[in-house]
């Protein structure tokens, strides 16, 4: 599971208010190379929750992203930053581990890179 996917997932348990971001508990992380596309990264930047991305990357042992989101000038001119953003967003893969609801602590397993977000009957 890539961090771009993680950034769009939330806990859907009935009655839960604090659904996002899911905390990552990584057991196995891999890196899979993806073609670098600066235009795609600039487009996606506005759609990404920066703090969730940084926290997710750090939980996967990647610490190259700044705490605060950069400004648009950086996006246009700093290829080094774009490559770090690209690596975190698209190349880091959570292969095995869990996603944890911030409110309930419910763990959703990730196996072979696929998050299991199915709920139990009492959670629907």
Swiss-Prot record:
Q: Which InterPro entries match?
A: Trm112 (IPR039127), Trm112-like (IPR005651)
A GO molecular-function annotation: protein heterodimerization activity
Q: In which tissues is it expressed?
A: Expressed in anthers.
Ranges of residues in domain TRM112: 2-120
Q: Which SUPFAM superfamilies match?
A: Trm112p-like
Source organism superkingdom: Eukaryota
Q: Which family does it belong to?
A: Belongs to the TRM112 family.
Its biological function? Acts as an activator of both rRNA/tRNA and protein methyltransferases. Required for TRM9 tRNA methyltransferase activity.
Query: What's the subunit arrangement here?
Result: Interacts with TRM9.
Q: What is this protein called?
A: Multifunctional methyltransferase subunit TRM112 homolog B
Species source reads Arabidopsis thaliana
- Phylogenetic lineage: Eukaryota, Viridiplantae, Streptophyta, Embryophyta, Tracheophyta
Q: Which gene encodes it?
A: TRM112B
